Amino acid sequence: MSPTALVRARPRWARLMGGFFALMLPPAVCAHAIVVESVPVHDARLETSPPRILLRFNTKIEHGLCRVGLEGPDGDIETPLDPPEAPERLQARVPPLVPGTYVLRYRTFSPDGHVTEGVLRFHVGK
């Protein structure tokens, strides 16, 4: 192989090896935090107010950087986060809610630094 061919081959080889190692990374290293379970579920129609809201993600989240906000018929509702029970879960206490439609907005950070924002709607009452 000529010296010129070696110079051309190295970058291709390096790219192939880089791609190979990227594929070998565990999914959690590359994953954005995606909600895999919520209580209540999106668009739920509840007869009574839920005592708390739960969001479970597909990966660990940085609890200290996460936020949730609940908006109802009478405006914003304080929803303090509970201490973490598991690295992939967020729980927030909810005061008794009056009948109406509620919107939960959340913002999480995963260990890879990616931000995930989302909205969950539910209805309380008939």
Predicted regions located by residue number:
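N-terminal signal peptide c-region/cleavage motif recognized by signal peptidases
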Residues: 26-28
